[in-house]
Amino acid sequence: LNNGIQLQCNDNKYLAADIFLPGGGTDQHVVESIPYNPPVSYNLGNSYASQLCNNDDRWGTVFSLNYGFPPDPNIPNFTFDFYGVTYPQAVIGANGLISFDYTNPNCFTQNPAAGCTFCQYTQEGSGPIPNTGRYRNCIMAPYYHINFSIGGDIYFQIIGEYPCRKMVLSYYQGPMFSCTSLLATHMCVLYETSNVIEFYLQNKPICTAWEDGLATLGIQNAAGNQGVTIPGYNNSVWGATNEAWRIKPVGELEYVMNWYKRSA
């Protein structure tokens, strides 16, 4: 072996390996339709995300991607690579946004005059993404006007084991603004290591009483010049029931494996 361990054919030796899986560095993605099989229930039983964002048209507080689920001290924190940058934190927008633009946690808005905690309920007039006039460096999961101040909840959970954990963010029975009898339930799942994003849509209603019912399901980079959306779901009128989609980086997963000898 390259590290100098020599093995004798008549000797029993025990080998172990450390596998290091760095985040991917790609800015290219593909979209896939996948079977509708949510990894957990939408009302997860842990209301952590409500503490981060539980109001109408507001950004929550910056949070660790393993918020409420601290790992073993010997296990790295949950991180996610998004357009070539690795993030340990994010911030939730009440209208279906997950933003990695947290360097200025008091001003997550394209319109500072509206107030720095204001999560704009509509940017549809700016057109489809990619678009510098829309929220950037974020996941639109989907992005449209939901009103959590009158009902519903946002749930958060980490499932699985390192290095294959999943961060689940679930928008559960959120009333549509101007159509409060219509309830939206959907979740976004982030995979560490592979940096895959999955969307599970139990029910995404259409409310044409507000902004003609326009909504966007996809991602956009920090510059606003690259974006990926589900076909037909880019600043358009669409509804979904029991659908699932995946956005995954293009390219092979890179890893490093270090072998070492240990005693029996």
Model-derived features with residue positions:
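Extracytoplasmic Ser/Thr/Pro-rich, glycosylation-prone low-complexity segments
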Residues: L1-A264
